[in-house]
């Protein structure tokens, strides 16, 4: 399998892992990037844009990364806090007064960041026509009653989180999340990533290949049991095929419809890996960059069905004796982003063939395992 790009010899096992994914058919097209001590040491891509394997993946190919998008939204919110414009411990209603309705007056901003707001889904059944309409979604969320007491437990806000964070940001800055991200992060870092794809980038978008059951949360529906998880995935109702539509690509869904490649994701998160600054561009203070690694809430996530530990947005290793300064998240289908401040490494894997996992899978794990082995060897 032809792999293009560059890879420092020390990280050759990363290239081997990508080649293996492609050769055994686990991937159709993918990109991988690693920054180490603020230098790009891996920038690779290979395979094809489409399931028919008729168009080769290019250096500037971008693709929808689902919940890896959340990591970009977290960075936007961290920047606002760093500037003193946002307090994570403040009530959401301080910035968004209408949000106080239906028992939400005391919901904190950090509850939104950490899937603890009780708003992992909507009572009203909505699909793509609604969740591509910002005003409709934020109006519904402002009126929604929490499904559990905010701050007392977690359930992954797969789609709703981006609207919640994005509306707080909009009330503070007057900009949409996509606008703020483009101006304050992507432009400053020269990163090819978008929350809402511009017209001139649309021809570069790879075609996502859905998993066998293309419904978000398909495994939950298969159980047939009413639960927080089932209700969360039932509305907003998302299917992988939605990503093929122009409405999806052009909308701003800051928890789910970011488009980019591994180079962009790794470059952006090199900021966190290097304590707030990358290649001479400082986006965060060192104190704020370090704060991401401090656990805010841990427990059994009712939507994901597993034990989790969350810092400010990002996932942390849920071990009581863990002292590693590492955070991560991934997207439905397989994309992933890993940031390790101890080694100052940022790792990203982005692909178009979706597997069933919601926050990454074994393909990205093989990439990250190879990258870490290259650093500690």
Where are these regions (language model features)?
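Short, conserved catalytic-motif segment at the N-terminal edge
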Residues: 2-65, 87
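Active-site SXXK
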Residues: 12, 18-19, 38, 62-89, ...
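Short, charged, amphipathic alpha-helices and their helix-cap/turn boundaries
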Residues: 41-44, 127-149, 175-192, 236-241
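Flexible glycine/proline-enriched surface loops and loop-helix/loop-strand junctions
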Residues: 58-60, 144-151, 161-163, 245-254
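Active-site helix/loop module of the DD-peptidase/beta-lactamase fold
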Residues: 59, 64-68, 82-124, 142-143, ...
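Active-site-proximal alpha-helical segments within enzyme catalytic domains
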Residues: 115, 161-168, 252, 256-278, ...
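Active-site Gly/Thr loop motif
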Residues: 206-262, 290-343
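Short, gly/Ser/Thr-rich active-site loops of penicillin-recognizing serine hydrolases
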Residues: 253, 274, 278, 288, ...
């Amino acid at each position: 399998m032809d792999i293009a790009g560059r890879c420092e010899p020390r990280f050759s096992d990363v290239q081997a892992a990508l080649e293996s994914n492609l050769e055994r058919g686990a991937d159709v097209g993918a990109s991988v990037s690693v920054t180490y001590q603020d230098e790009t040491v891996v920038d690779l891509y290979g395979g094809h844009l489409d399931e028919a394997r008729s168009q080769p993946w290019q250096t500037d190919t971008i693709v929808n990364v689902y919940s890896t998008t959340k990591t970009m939204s977290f960075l936007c919110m961290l920047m606002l806090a760093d500037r003193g414009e946002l307090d994570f411990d403040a009530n959401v209603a301080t910035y968004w007064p209408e949000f106080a309705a239906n028992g939400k007056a005391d919901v904190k901003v950090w509850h939104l960041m950490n899937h603890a707001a009780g708003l992992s889904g909507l009572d009203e059944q909505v699909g793509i026509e609604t969740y591509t309409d910002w005003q409709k979604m934020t109006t519904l969320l402002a009126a929604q009653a929490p499904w559990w007491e905010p701050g007392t437990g977690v359930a992954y806000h797969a789609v709703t989180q981006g609207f919640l964070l994005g509306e707080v940001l909009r009330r503070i800055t007057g900009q949409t999340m996509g606008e703020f991200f483009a101006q304050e992060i992507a432009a400053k870092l020269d990163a090819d990533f978008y929350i809402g794809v511009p017209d001139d980038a649309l021809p570069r978008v790879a075609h996502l290949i859905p998993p066998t059951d293309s419904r978000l949360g398909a495994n939950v529906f298969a159980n047939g049991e009413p639960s927080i998880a089932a209700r969360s995935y039932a509305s907003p109702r998302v299917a992988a095929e939605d990503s093929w539509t122009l409405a999806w690509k052009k909308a701003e869904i800051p928890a789910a419809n970011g488009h980019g490649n591994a180079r962009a994701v790794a470059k952006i998160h090199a900021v966190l890996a290097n304590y707030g600054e990358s290649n001479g561009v400082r986006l965060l203070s060192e104190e704020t960059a370090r704060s991401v690694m401090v656990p805010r809430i841990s427990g059994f996530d009712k939507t994901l069905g597993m034990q989790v530990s969350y810092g400010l947005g990002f996932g942390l290793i849920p071990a009581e004796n863990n002292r590693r300064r590492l955070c991560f998240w991934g997207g439905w289908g397989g994309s992933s982003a890993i940031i390790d401040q101890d080694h100052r490494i940022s790792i990203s894997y982005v692909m178009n063939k979706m597997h069933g996992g919601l926050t990454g899978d074994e393909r990205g794990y093989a990439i990250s395992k190879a990258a870490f082995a290259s650093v500690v060897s």
